């Protein structure tokens, strides 16, 4: 499908579009089609004009994904700074009837925030501070968007996304928006089941009121801790592997002697062993090969099979 096949679009549609610049690893091939919607309503218009069997891939900050060098079949939709609405919502409108969780809406010192999928978690954390909501500070440590955080139950510094969620909006392939509650999903550590060929487009988050100064202090402390322990400013995806029960992936990788291990220009970080860096000219194939090497070596040394946190997509 070419651009002339679409009407009424206010966003930007590209064909055969390079994707590396949209990922934090700065690697990956091209998308057959790439769409940057103007907003949520424009996205709906776009989806209604796509064939029902068109493969869809959703991309936010590109921080938890490895796109293979052969690129992606179908259409890639960029949500970052496109689905960007962020606001305190009227408690009377947010899931009262469907959820049955009256305690969320009774005042009770709580505030409900609606954040669309393309809002960065860092921006959500800062918004929480502006509202004096101390328990949203952990979002500052998640290097991604709200959509990605919802899709994988992202977490940082002891906080997890779905502990704060009271409802979500999803969109299906036809552009229809559905409101759903947490009990419709199976929530696990870094995994969410039950999306059923839909995509998260917004989340409703419930936070406790607190001291704004304490909230700001909490974020600054978390960011300082992250900067000391992680290779911030380098081309990476964040954590590559999930932490196994009762242990840490970084400890297992480091104790296996893999810090500094490289394949091509992909390298296990010397600062944090659960980070793989693109030293400048790595291919997606280099990074994927190093991921497999690390997992295999840790399994041989420790007898523990690490599970990938990063999503690997596209064609080789």
UniProtKB/Swiss-Prot annotation:
GO cellular component: cytosol
Subcellular location: Cytoplasm
Keyword Cell wall biogenesis/degradation part of the UniProt annotation: yes
Active site: 190, 239 (proton donor), 309
This protein's record includes keyword Flavoprotein: yes
Cofactor: FAD
GO biological process annotation, one example: peptidoglycan biosynthetic process
Disulfide bonding pattern of the chain: none
Pathway note: Cell wall biogenesis; peptidoglycan biosynthesis
Cited Gene3D superfamilies: 3.30.465.10, UDP-N-acetylenolpyruvoylglucosamine reductase, C-terminal domain, Uridine Diphospho-n-acetylenolpyruvylglucosamine Reductase, domain 2
Main subcellular location: cytoplasm
HAMAP family xref list: MurB
Role this protein plays: Cell wall formation.
The name this protein goes by in its record: UDP-N-acetylenolpyruvoylglucosamine reductase
Lineage: Bacteria, Pseudomonadati, Pseudomonadota, Gammaproteobacteria, Legionellales
